[in-house]
From Swiss-Prot:
Modified residues (Phosphohistidine): H242
Organism of provenance: Rhizobium etli (strain ATCC 51251 / DSM 11541 / JCM 21823 / NBRC 15573 / CFN 42)
GO biological process annotation, one example: NAD biosynthetic process via the salvage pathway
Source species, domain of life: Bacteria
Keyword flag Protein biosynthesis: no
Matches recorded under SUPFAM superfamilies: Nicotinate/Quinolinate PRTase C-terminal domain-like, Nicotinate/Quinolinate PRTase N-terminal domain-like
EC top class named in words: ligase
Protein name: Nicotinate phosphoribosyltransferase
Protein encoded by which gene: pncB
Reaction(s) catalysed by this chain's protein: nicotinate + 5-phospho-alpha-D-ribose 1-diphosphate + ATP + H2O = nicotinate beta-D-ribonucleotide + ADP + phosphate + diphosphate
Keyword Phosphoprotein: yes
Function per UniProt: Catalyzes the synthesis of beta-nicotinate D-ribonucleotide from nicotinate and 5-phospho-D-ribose 1-phosphate at the expense of ATP.
């Protein structure tokens, strides 16, 4: 892959539009896996997505120009899958399985266009919503987040001269490489890039991916970014996300359907994929509630991704549950992915080494860590906690409880209803940085 002088590229403002989203597959792999399931099993469900800035002290509408934001969102809507991308999706093997995407699905996807958006301002924040068919709105999540994050980075660097930008990126590269050197100390490490949604920029994410590929070799198991996986000849990695049980729960008409919503999604997922993709995401309505009510067959799945509890604490609870269910944790997989920095990766790896199989998804602290790299402090380069979540399904409000109350989303009255129903056991209030 040709190397790009990122600092020079950032400084050069000569073109009319520098697109942030270059392809519809500049997204996370699990969005495509989930999209096929939605297209096949939930084609008539409508779902709205809403941008949520959890770092409320940062007023995005004061940092990002509305015209620039609309221009990038509009450009993303012009994108279609290329012939090369379609051939790669149809012909490549993913997770050891050929033709994971059905021909009929790919035929539908070949004409896919991102739907319209609604954008306004309120109290210094952008209100960005996507309404319509779930199989269309779901694909806005990653590009919307990537656009907002990169526009914020561009705004923060707009006044910097070429030498200042050179210093900024040189320091960021050195900082990133020092992390690579530390990761080399972990034998048997398996780590992948999960950093698309809150990246500093596409070019910087690509640099980080190439650095990991060269720096730690086989320990780098792939990237969640489909475009980078294709272009860099890497594995595309990812399974499923909270939106699936959130929508299933929102659609529930009875208490029994609500309680079974997470397990219904797992059954649906198993029908479509099975095999190496059987990874449980347990925390949509609290891990404690999920484990309490889980059918025994869940213990036969490959592993869990504890996403919002502290990694060591969350991992221990799942190991205890496997033992209770008569399963050997050493044959199981834990995927850690929540706000990890190098220290957390090393501490978690050493804590569980030899007790369970492990993999790490490294996100924002991989692709957007510029703290201390600018010659003077630039707050706009510090990452923020921003998400794009399902807000309703078929007009019914959607909720995510999480193991961390700071990550809960949904209308307050609905959040309270879910808490009373599922319980608040083992939820730990932690400051959310990214």
């Amino acid at each position: 892959m040709a190397k790009t002088d990122i600092a020079r590229r950032v400084y050069n403002h000569a073109w009319k539009l520098d697109p942030i989203i270059r392809s519809l597959i500049d997204t996370d792999f699990y969005k495509l896996l989930m999209l096929q399931m939605i297209w096949k099993l939930y084609p008539d469900v409508n779902a709205s997505f809403t941008l949520i800035n959890r770092t409320k002290r940062v007023h995005l509408a004061e940092e990002i120009d509305e015209g620039d934001l609309r221009e990038q969102l509009d450009h993303a809507r012009t994108l279609r899958l290329s012939k090369k991308e379609m051939i790669w999706l149809a012909g490549n093997s993913f997770y050891g399985r050929a033709q994971i995407f059905e021909p009929e699905f790919l035929a539908w996807l070949s004409n896919f266009q991102l739907p319209e958006y609604e954008l306004s301002k309120k109290d210094g924040q952008y209100v960005l919503d996507f309404h319509g068919s779930w199989k269309e709105t779901t694909m806005w999540e990653i590009p919307a987040l990537a656009i907002v994050n990169e526009l914020r980075s561009r705004s923060a660097m707009k006044a910097l001269g070429p030498f200042t930008l050179d210093v900024l990126y040189a320091r960021a590269k050195a900082k990133m490489w020092s992390k690579v050197e530390r990761l080399k100390e972990l034998p048997g490490l398996r780590i992948s890039d999960f950093g698309t949604r809150r990246r500093h920029s596409f070019l910087w994410q690509r640099w980080c991916v190439e650095a990991l590929k060269e720096g730690i070799g086989p320990a780098f198991t792939g990237t969640s970014n489909v475009l980078l996986a294709m272009d860099s000849d890497l594995e595309a990695v990812g399974t499923n996300a909270h939106e699936l049980p959130m929508v299933a729960a929102a659609l529930a008409q009875t208490d029994e359907q609500l309680r079974n919503a997470p397990y219904k999604i797992l059954r649906d997922w198993n029908k479509l994929y099975g095999g190496n993709l059987l990874i449980v995401l347990p925390d949509a309505f609290g891990t404690a509630a999920f484990l309490r009510d889980a059918p025994e067959w869940v213990a036969d799945w490959t592993g869990f991704r504890p996403d919002s509890a502290p990694p060591i604490e969350g991992g221990e609870k799942i190991i205890d549950w496997w033992k209770k269910m008569g399963r050997d944790p050493r044959q199981k997989l834990l995927i850690f992915s929540d706000g990890l920095d190098v220290d957390a990766i090393i501490d978690t790896y050493r804590h569980f080494e030899g007790r369970v199989r492990m993999s790490f998804g490294w996100g924002t602290n991989l692709t957007n860590d510029f703290a201390g790299c600018a010659p003077t402090e630039i707050s706009g380069l510090n990452p923020i906690s921003i998400v794009c979540k399902v807000s309703d399904a078929n007009g019914r409000p959607a909720v995510k409880l999480s193991d961390n109350p700071q990550k809960a989303t949904g209308e307050p009255a609905e959040v309270e209803r879910y808490l009373k129903f599922f319980g608040a056991e083992d939820r730990v209030d932690q400051t959310v940085l990214v």
